[in-house]
Amino acid sequence: MNEAATVLGTADIQEILKLLPHRYPFLLVDRIIEIDSDNSAIGIKNVTANEPHFTGHFPEKPIMPGVLLIEGMAQTAGAICARKTGGGSNLVYFMTIDNARFRKPVVPGDRVEFHVVKQKQRGNIWKFHCDAKVDGQLVAEADIGAMIVSKEDV
């Protein structure tokens, strides 16, 4: 772990489980290696061959569905929002997706890094620019919006 990540903050799987309501098979962030307050984060997803979506996408040439890359970005952004606004006492709803682009396939054995950067925040609405990278190469990108809602209001 580098010194900057220690200063900025990290989240292991136990903390992620406290921040996000997602569970297997839909929890798509294994670890967060860097969190800069409410401004940015880098989440990690270790892609393995035994994930359920690979049985049908595609049996002879498994490729991680692009929608799951977007969801991993959203979960990383959601962890920032949840951590900043009271942890597990709130829900973070994924609201919008714009400018999504998929550049390269993600396959079993890849380690995806979800880089999310807050673009703006107004009240309980947050906007992020997100990149997904494998071995430093851009594989997907999108702009996403999220809304924070108290669990009591749901």
UniProtKB/Swiss-Prot annotation:
One Gene Ontology term, aspect cellular component: membrane
UniProt record similarity statement: Belongs to the thioester dehydratase family. FabZ subfamily.
Record-level Gene Ontology MF annotations: (3R)-hydroxyacyl-[acyl-carrier-protein] dehydratase activity
The protein's Enzyme Commission number: 4.2.1.59
Active site annotation, chain numbering: H57
Keyword hit for Cytoplasm: yes
Keywords: Cytoplasm, Lipid A biosynthesis, Lipid biosynthesis, Lipid metabolism, Lyase
Its job: Involved in unsaturated fatty acids biosynthesis. Catalyzes the dehydration of short chain beta-hydroxyacyl-ACPs and long chain saturated and unsaturated beta-hydroxyacyl-ACPs.
Enzyme class: lyase
Compartments where found: Cytoplasm
Gene3D superfamilies: Hotdog Thioesterase
UniProt-listed SUPFAM superfamilies: Thioesterase/thiol ester dehydrase-isomerase
Superkingdom, taxonomy of origin: Bacteria
Descriptive protein name: 3-hydroxyacyl-[acyl-carrier-protein] dehydratase FabZ
Main localization, broad class: cytoplasm
Catalytic activity from the UniProt record: a (3R)-hydroxyacyl-[ACP] = a (2E)-enoyl-[ACP] + H2O
One biological process term in Gene Ontology: lipid A biosynthetic process
Keyword Lipid metabolism: yes
Gene: fabZ
